Amino acid sequence: WQRNPYKGQNFDLQTDIPYLFNSNVGMNMKVNIFRQDSTFANVKALPAFYYHINNRQKIGLRGTFENSTILDSLYVQGKDYNKKGIGVYFDMTEPSDIDLFLYKTKINFGYDYLTTTYTKENIKSPQNQFYFFGEYNYHINGNHFLNIKAEGAMLDSKVNFTANELYRFGGWNSLRGFNENSLSADFYYYGSLEYRYLIG
């Protein structure tokens, strides 16, 4: 659960079962609820099944079920919508020998084909969604490390997006110097280079 300075509240819940019935098939379920003060609320569920290529790599198939409701009738930048779709993704994680690092290398990218229905206008629109994340902790020598990170995402549609369906980013885990989830766009990318010195 996270609250940002702009009265936005974000709740994430995730469960993962890596080896169903002792097979190489796993299951993942994510639920996200985002509420922006009293203007709108988004609820998203992402059920997924994936296959372990090896102990570091997996490919998966996921569904997207999203519902957004405008809570304030004076909020004209957003619209009520339902979103459904299917997507594929790839994930690679290389573990780290350093306990403070979650991993040495992580690469995740995916594509989703979505159908969005704007309920009050009775408009249906196909959408394409692309996502990429990559991070690498490079050991220079001794206690000196370099963290290299890149992330990007894009929504593509023939219909203009509403404010309540845009990506929200910014903050400690993405663009530092901005408040959490204070930026929104249908396309973003960024890269960062960070020097780290481990004490001890």
Task: Give the label of every model feature segment.
Residues 86-200:
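C-terminal outer-membrane beta-barrel translocator/porin domains of Gram-negative envelope proteins
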Residues 1-108, 168-171, 182-185:
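Gram-negative/organellar outer-membrane beta-barrel architecture
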